[in-house]
């Protein structure tokens, strides 16, 4: 049974926006249908009836791109949507990040957010519509949520900021930023940029926040009209008496958290916890739940002391000051057969990035609900369990790995040379070998070194750094180059990557409601200083890209042919191009504009393939001289091959200055002769002459004598109308147009 639909409308980035509630998915705790232009997104929120016995908040966000939204039927045998693509995974993370901090502390009900893209208009962002729909569904539901939030995309076209740029505007923008937050603060940023200065990045974030405030006011109208009362929930609290008793352990905790080395520090903390758990085992044997609280209380002390030491005493767990970067080390060229390798180490975080160069045909084909595209630059990030000293099952890359890989890709894309300048597909793989925080940023540094080691002519080196934040009341401390414990116990993970001239990528996640302009400004400046320090170190390892590619990398040459000739090169069913590949051992890719890429590690194979393709697409030019081969002899003349696939007729009268009665008196099959093309008729048939070349070789006196002889011969002939009819029919029968 259909419910009563209520519609709320406004505009967003110059396009119509409407929200429908009350009609669809009524059994969910909350649902909203968002129409933005021709984009239609359904967002639903469901909560479990009872809390889960977990030590974390069980929130799941699934963003699903339905292929019917763009009128496509899925491929594959089943013709169903399969596992989510990379864009869907990244969008799920994008929506999760701004809503997660706004659920109550200690809230443990299972929350599932599902977003269906049901119609997709490329000019009206389904991702941002999905974020808006999620916030509305949560805000009008009975689920406790300290929203609403909103998110927008900000671009910069011709120096002007634009809200939710269209696909055409995105082609021109030097900045693409997604920012989300509440009416009072920003709590999520994701950006890719073309070396944008820090002040421009900050202004773009604040520009987006103004639009966020307007969208939140719009949502509040919806909540006032249809919002449900929030359900009651319980949050377990530690026993106050037990907490007071365990205060005796605090001095030992303070000492343990200041052990500088990661594993030694973890061991020291665990020893303190184990000691006090053992002390209380006998006493609390009849109260197992309270015994479980002992480790929880002590872990809370660990968090409290780490944060206090940083904010009050300005001392970090490893002894650094807030703005100090861990020791750096880097190397290149470690793997002899790989095309490029960069090993980057920062403290106890180490990443080996490997660059592989491939042909254009190796590019990844992206075919989702967006426009189909070929992706010639890829960055993949792997995080094996041994990197943190653990033994656990190895599975396919998860959301975190995909997200970190995409962040590195976004950071490096602005420095990758254009296809016309460097016609290679580039794949980077970052293997995390050790991790104690900031591994995604180490992968960016390692990847830059790998690109330079591979000889890729990058625009400029890129480095990345992760900033942190500890906030206690009105006091806060911004941390440079956070390690794992600071990331885990801190309030912000703020990743900034860029060149010496500006930012290429930025990502911010926070665990508090939001941060202010002042904190953003300080974090960006501190990150800039740190980034420049890291870049200086990297350039000491390898100052410029290598001038030569690895001998194991394919050589790629390009040639341009007439697009009308592409079908001739490919041949029926690919017969011709496959024949060239089989004979030469090369890889061949042909673009629609007639650009041909020929790749191989063997230069001779490349040269032969170029010659074969050149013969296929070569055009006959009137007036040019060719070294031809006699292929067929007829009474009226001989057919000669000018080059492979192109023949011409040399008429019997065009062989010599003298009259030729029999063609075979002057040429034989297989003879090589020089001829000059004299005509291409309207049917494409080519006429050539040997006599024309002989005439060109005569001296003026010889030519004059020849012309006089011809004139005399013509005058001695009887008139044409007095001649009898020819007995052999036409002078020249039809011939092949080859």
From Swiss-Prot:
Residues 704-738 are annotated as: Disordered. InterPro entries: ExoRNase_PH_dom1 (IPR001247), ExoRNase_PH_dom2 (IPR015847), ExoRNase_PH_dom2_sf (IPR036345), KH_dom (IPR004087), KH_dom_type_1 (IPR004088), KH_dom_type_1_sf (IPR036612), NA-bd_OB-fold (IPR012340), PNPase (IPR012162). One of its GO terms (biological process) is mRNA catabolic process. Its cofactor is Mg(2+). It holds the Pfam family RNase_PH_C. It is found in: Cytoplasm. Keywords: Cytoplasm, Magnesium, Metal-binding, Nucleotidyltransferase, RNA-binding, Transferase. Its main location: cytoplasm. Gene3D superfamilies: GHMP Kinase, N-terminal domain, K Homology domain, type 1, Nucleic acid-binding proteins. GO terms for molecular function: 3'-5'-RNA exonuclease activity; magnesium ion binding; polyribonucleotide nucleotidyltransferase activity; RNA binding. One of its GO terms (cellular component) is cytosol. The keyword rRNA processing does not apply. Residues 554-613 form the KH domain. Its EC number is 2.7.7.8. It catalyses: RNA(n+1) + phosphate = RNA(n) + a ribonucleoside 5'-diphosphate. Residues 623-691 form the S1 motif domain. CDD domains: KH-I_PNPase, RNase_PH_PNPase_1, RNase_PH_PNPase_2, S1_PNPase. It comes from the Bacteria. Mg(2+) binds at residues 487, 493. Involved in mRNA degradation. Catalyzes the phosphorolysis of single-stranded polyribonucleotides processively in the 3'- to 5'-direction. Belongs to the polyribonucleotide nucleotidyltransferase family. This is Polyribonucleotide nucleotidyltransferase. It comes from Exiguobacterium sp. (strain ATCC BAA-1283 / AT1b).
């Amino acid at each position: 049974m259909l419910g009563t639909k209520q519609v709320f409308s406004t505009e967003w980035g110059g396009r119509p926006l409407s929200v429908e509630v009350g009609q669809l998915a009524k059994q969910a705790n909350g649902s909203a249908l968002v129409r933005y232009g021709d984009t239609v997104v359904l967002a639903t929120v469901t909560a479990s009836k009872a809390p889960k016995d977990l030590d974390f908040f069980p929130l799941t966000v699934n963003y699903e791109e339905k292929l019917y939204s763009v009128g496509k039927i899925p491929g594959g045998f089943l013709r169903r949507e399969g596992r989510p693509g990379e864009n869907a995974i990244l969008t799920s993370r994008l929506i999760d990040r701004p809503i997660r901090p706004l659920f109550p502390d200690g809230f443990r009900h299972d929350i599932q957010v599902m977003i269906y893209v049901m119609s997709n208009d490329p000019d009206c962002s389904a991702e941002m519509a999905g974020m808006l729909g999620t916030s509305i569904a949560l805000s009008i539901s009975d689920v406790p949520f300290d929203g609403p939030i909103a998110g927008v995309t900000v671009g910069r076209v011709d120096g002007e900021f634009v809200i939710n740029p269209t696909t055409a505007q995105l082609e021109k923008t030097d900045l693409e930023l997604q920012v989300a937050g509440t009416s009072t603060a920003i709590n999520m940023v994701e950006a890719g940029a073309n070396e944008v200065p820090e002040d421009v990045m900050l202004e773009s974030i604040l520009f987006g926040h103004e639009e966020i405030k307007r969208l939140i006011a719009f949502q509040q109208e919806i909540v006032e009209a249809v919002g449900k009362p929030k359900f009651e929930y319980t949050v377990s609290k530690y026993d106050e008496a037990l907490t007071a008793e365990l205060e005796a352990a605090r001095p030992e905790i303070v000492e343990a958290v200041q052990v500088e080395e990661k594993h030694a520090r973890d061991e020291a903390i665990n020893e303190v916890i184990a000691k006090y758990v053992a002390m209380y085992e006998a006493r609390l044997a009849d109260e197992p739940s309270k015994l479980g609280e002992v480790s929880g209380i002590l872990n809370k002390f660990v968090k409290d002391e780490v944060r206090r030491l940083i904010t009050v005493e300005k001392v970090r767990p490893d002894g650094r000051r807030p703005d100090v970067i861990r020791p750096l080390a880097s190397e290149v060229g470690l793997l002899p057969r790989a095309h490029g390798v960069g090993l980057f180490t920062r403290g106890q975080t180490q990443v080996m990035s490997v660059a592989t160069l491939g042909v254009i045909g190796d590019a990844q084909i992206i075919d989702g609900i967006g426009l189909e595209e070929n992706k010639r630059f890829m960055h993949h990030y792997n995080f094996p369990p041994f990197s943190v000293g653990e033994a656990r099952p190895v599975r396919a890359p998860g959301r975190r790995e995909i997200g970190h890989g995409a962040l590195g890709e976004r950071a490096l894309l602005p420095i990758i040379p254009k296809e016309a300048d460097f016609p290679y597909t580039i794949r980077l793989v970052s293997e995390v070998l050790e991790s104690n925080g900031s591994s995604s940023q180490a992968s960016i540094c390692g990847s830059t070194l790998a690109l330079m080691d591979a000889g890729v002519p990058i625009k400029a080196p890129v480095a990345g750094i992760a900033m942190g934040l500890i906030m206690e009341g009105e006091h806060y401390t911004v941390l440079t180059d956070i390690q794992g414990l600071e990331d885990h116990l801190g309030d912000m993970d703020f990743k900034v990557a860029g060149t010496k001239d500006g930012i290429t990528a930025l990502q911010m996640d926070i665990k508090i409601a939001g941060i202010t302009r002042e904190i953003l400004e300080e974090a960006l400046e501190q990150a800039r200083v740190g980034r420049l320090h890291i870049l200086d170190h990297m350039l000491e390892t390898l100052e410029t890209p290598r001038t030569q590619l690895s001998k194991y990398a394919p050589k790629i040459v390009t040639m341009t042919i007439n697009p009308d000739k592409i079908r001739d090169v490919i041949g029926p069913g690919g017969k011709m191009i496959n024949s060239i590949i089989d004979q030469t051992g090369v890889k061949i890719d042909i673009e629609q504009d007639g650009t041909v890429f020929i790749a191989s590690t063997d230069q001779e194979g490349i040269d032969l393939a170029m010659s074969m393709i050149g013969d296929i697409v070569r055009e006959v030019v009137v007036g040019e001289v060719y070294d031809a081969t006699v292929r067929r002899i007829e009474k009226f003349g001989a057919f000669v091959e000018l080059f492979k696939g192109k023949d011409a007729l040399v008429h019997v009268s065009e062989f010599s200055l003298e009259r030729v009665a029999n063609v075979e008196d002057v040429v034989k099959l297989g003879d090589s002769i020089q001829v000059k093309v004299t005509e291409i008729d309207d049917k494409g048939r080519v006429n050539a002459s040997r006599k024309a070349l002989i005439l060109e070789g005569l001296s003026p006196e010889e030519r004059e004598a020849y012309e006089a002889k011809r004139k005399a011969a013509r005058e001695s002939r009887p008139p044409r109308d007095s001649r009898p009819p020819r007995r052999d029919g036409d002078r020249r029968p039809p011939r092949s147009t080859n």
